[in-house]
């Protein structure tokens, strides 16, 4: 299914990405990424906060983000319009881009997995 959306979606991690922290602590903001995401949202795009945090640790992260001027369209969940579009809420976040300090691009992965 090829659906054309009028906006794009970024899902972003928290620890080590938005915030230089060591879970469950809160640390220094990644100001460059925060500014980028604010501009992205100002252009009409959507943001999903996608950390591994839950409970109080998640609530603290969301509050920390608000204090940095970041508001998210969803937290640890798909956007409601995506759920409606597909008729279910998959465990994998549907987005155009994932930003995470632990990510590995496919070309990098091919190099890592190459057996010589």
Give the location of each predicted region.
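HAD-like aspartate-dependent phosphatase fold
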Residues: 1-116
